[in-house]
Design a protein with these regions (language model features):
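Short beta-strand-loop
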Residues: 1-28, 48, 98-102
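Glycine-rich phosphate-binding loop signature in dinucleotide/nucleotide-binding domains
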Residues: 49-54
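Short, conserved alpha-helix that lines the donor NDP-sugar binding/gating region
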Residues: 38, 42, 46
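Von Willebrand factor
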Residues: 1-17, 41-42, 57-61, 90-94
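VWA/integrin I-like adhesion module and closely mimicked acidic/polar interface patches used
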Residues: 29-36, 64-115
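C-terminal "exit" segments of structured domains
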Residues: 117-130
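Generic recognition of flexible, low-complexity loop/linker segments
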Residues: 45-48, 75-76
Length: 130
């Protein structure tokens, strides 16, 4: 799920055997412009859990800051408890280390690119899940 401002969101679903390398490259190159809104991509991820991804967790990758209203966070926490999913944040904060405060209210684990290289983050995430 690619996201930017509240009106910019694009969902790419890659099911086994139903996508090409070019599809993945196109997704990797997606840029929707500036702005950051966390609510819409989180809502999209939860909706995907209703259509075949019911045992999924969310990996939330961002370089931005966004405050979510407390009532939304309460609803999100209820969804997390009911569906038993976790949200792992990956914060692209190499230019401004320590800016985790907008991920803290809804992520169970936060990795910072200012502290770990990309491959270290992947190894850590995989070792926790396997």
């Amino acid at each position: 799920i690619h996201f930017a401002g509240s009106s910019s969101c694009k969902v790419d679903v890659f099911l086994p055997g139903q996508h090409s390398m070019q599809d993945k490259m196109n997704a990797a190159e997606t840029f929707l412009g500036g702005g950051t809104d966390f609510k819409r991509p989180l809502d999209e991820a939860i909706q995907l859990m209703d259509v075949g991804f019911e045992n999924a967790d969310i990996v939330f990758l961002t370089d931005g800051l966004c405050e979510l209203p407390e009532d939304y966070l309460a609803t999100l926490r209820k969804e997390q408890a009911a569906r038993k999913f976790t949200v792992t944040g990956i914060l692209l904060d190499a230019g401004s280390p320590g800016m985790d405060f907008s991920l803290t209210p809804f992520c169970q684990k936060i990795y910072r690119t200012s502290e770990l290289a990309g491959d270290e983050i992947v190894r850590s995430m995989v070792s926790q899940r396997v």
